């Protein structure tokens, strides 16, 4: 294709005819394209070029010197000479300015280029086409569209090169609307006809928006001006159509091409892949091979990416074998793509082999492996690979640090996370929002939420992921109030996505914030965000955990149902001890042809356990493999709980001894809890011994043992367990309960003395305590005659915060209205008896969801049966 004098290639001399580009000039061995054939006459070879003597002050001589310096690429000396010429008021010729501007562009010297620009403007009222084009090309190359636009306005005359450069500059930086406006202005105001360089720029703009209607309009112009057979223009048209999703039109153009180059094939093949038509793209690739067209790097990386999207391991291996025959297997970008393909397909061992055989590894290679390990749930290997990378003296970038931080978050590896935080600060990677977001996630999962908050507040431009990370982190650290406050703050500047709202709904479910959950539901219905994703299940879970089963059923019936939807309902009824309903739901689920998973059977077994449906529970356990589910340790723990709650402790112990796998602390914990229920100290101590051999850091097992001893009156043993906890540095979360009144959630701590209605709350509770004493029921108050150790045990492991929440609800709601309370710890026996008494006395329904059960109190009875 012949190059036009008005083309946007920077190495041509715009504004002059092609005859000026002589054959001798083109063949000259000069590295600088701005040498216009003027020989380096009168060039001074002395070092004192910054000062001009009076004898050398002629304009012609000075301009010749300056032009010669530009021709030799000596920018620093050229700038010194320019400054001296300005001091002596020696005029600079326009062609010398052009040479100097092109040198600044080639050297990427933005500061010097701006200075030359200022000098030129101060000495000229307007810019000629050649100098204006030089400034345009320079500023566009620097990404400075503001000054480029100003230069464009100062030009006394413009040619096609001027328009092409500016349109291309706007398109390259993503200002597609502005680029299209310039194109139309060029046609209708500038009176300039587009050429083979104009159309690719404009078509790139249409594909970038994307705007198919404008793209078709430009296609009409291509035909009108006679460029429909130009291969570069047609390639640009194909790319535009596939970017706009019109693959059919792109293929029509492709099939009509009289001649195709590798760019044509790549545009069509990658276009199929970008539009999710991987099989069609692969068919075209095989057709290309059949025509003996050799692929290039772009072809192969695109095809490998398609195999990755398809998850087809066999096809991926075939493509890998073909790549080896092409000789591109040693190319690092191809190796990186193959590694990514294997990792995404779950074939991490094959990725390891390929990675180990790579002769040279760049930062992308290491980051791909680290991210791939994390993707395949191998965070240990991800961190080990990072250590290897460090030993190989490869400096991580922001993507690497983010990937390793994600692995640290999965493992709860705070030490490595802090190390990476320091590295990010030192390497100035902390300014990348992806690093900050992953630091928030890491600190949140390592229970350092205050550190996560510090990082969040220091992010100058928070994106949706930043807000989502901190909201999820606050929820994870049981600071649900703050999570919901952050959601409201986020809505002032950004729209939450489905993941954000899912985290917020989990916070609502945790503290029983029904009204806030309903607000989120209304937002979802109004905006439609996440309706086809996992958000409906999050809404269902929120209603179930807030105790609104009728609303939960309405949500369940209105949404697309998957195994997670059924599991949420099963868990909800299981927590309420409604085993018959759990069994009925399971049967309906199977009849609906939804395949149960391991979580389904956990809920099913727990439901049978709490309803003492031993026979049915054992039957379902024996049939698990019929549904393709292999029992794991959680299921074995459920069976132990099933037998233990029913009083069959010896059978439960024998079941543990016959397990085909080694029991974990959860299995022994289920037996310990059964011993607590039935006051069996010997077997309980045996269970605790096995637990503490395996796990000395889980506070819940210490609480179970304490409760076993306390229920049997062994207060010295309670004190011993308390000392063990202290020696191991274990603490119990403070008791906290939440109650929603008039759409607002109120929190109550066990030792809360600062609530504005504390006096009224205490008065109400004391009234109930007096009535309980009158009928011979025990109570917990400061005047209790109970052993101090027992009082301490109840205060620590329960806190009685639900009593304050219930009293607050009674004070601030009308008689007869149900009260819903959520608690972070388990209810103690005394609180359970107290709430039963209150429900009977005030004739109200009171629901309390604690850490283990859902208690529904009515007329002095509880749904749990205790």
From Swiss-Prot:
Transit peptide: 1-52
Keywords associated with the record: Chloroplast, Plastid, Repeat, Transit peptide
GO cellular component, one term: chloroplast
Segments for region (Type E(+) motif): 743-773
Outcome of gene disruption: Albino cotyledons without primary leaf and seedling lethality under autotrophic growth conditions.
GO biological processes: chloroplast organization; response to light stimulus; RNA modification
PPR repeat extents: 58-92, 93-123, 128-158, 159-194, 195-229, 230-260, 261-295, 296-330, 331-365, 366-396, 397-431, 432-466, 467-493, 497-531, 532-561, 562-596, 597-631, 632-662
Region (Type DYW motif): 774-866
Reported impact of residue 500 to I: In ecb2-2; delayed chloroplast development and plant greening
GO molecular-function terms, A-Z: RNA binding; zinc ion binding
Lineage: superkingdom: Eukaryota
Region annotated Type E motif, chain positions: 667-742
Predominant location category: plastid
Signal peptide: none
Subcellular localization, as worded in the UniProt entry: Plastid, Chloroplast
Task of the protein: Regulates the RNA editing of the chloroplast transcript accD, and is essential for the early stages of chloroplast biogenesis. Required for the RNA editing of the chloroplast transcript ndhF.
Similarity annotation: Belongs to the PPR family. PCMP-H subfamily.
Protein name as it appears in the record: Pentatricopeptide repeat-containing protein At1g15510, chloroplastic
Organism listed in the record: Arabidopsis thaliana (Mouse-ear cress)
